[in-house]
Amino acid sequence: LQLFKVFNVSRGQKIEKRLAKMGIVLPAPLVLPSNNRTSAVQSGNLLYVSGHGAALLDDSDIVKRGKVGIEVSEEDAYRTARACAIKMLATVKYYIGGLDRVTRIVQIHGLINAHPDFERHNMVLNGASDFFYEVFGEEVGCHSRYAMGVGGLVARQPIEIDGIFEISAE
């Protein structure tokens, strides 16, 4: 069962154009108003992106609070994970100047605020994984990951994701 269309990846095609074809407009990036932390840190050719949670999303159609498996359906949590991934791309673009510099999505981590009996954390995080694969294709978008159920998140968010992106030099 394929839930999304994978665009043909070619070297000349720009990621921003692909997003536009998908009807996706990047939201404002996550910029933390703090001296002791940042929403992304570059070390060598890796960009470490801080957690992006549902409470930070601009989309009013996304579920921003609640526990998956009780107040939030698996389908809504999947859509929320996808929206968090879109917000992450906005942050990546803000920090490195352009998404075409992403050469690999190395890893994503998902924290799912879920009922203790909920067992499909991996399906929720597929919202982000499917999105990255759809946008970047197999070579760049296929990544390692983990999905973990937790007893709670800040502001009762249903999900928070962070990631590691490999980037090219300017």
Where are these regions (language model features)?
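N-terminal presequence-like segments and the immediate start of the first folded domain
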Residues: Q2-I86, A90-H109, A114-E170
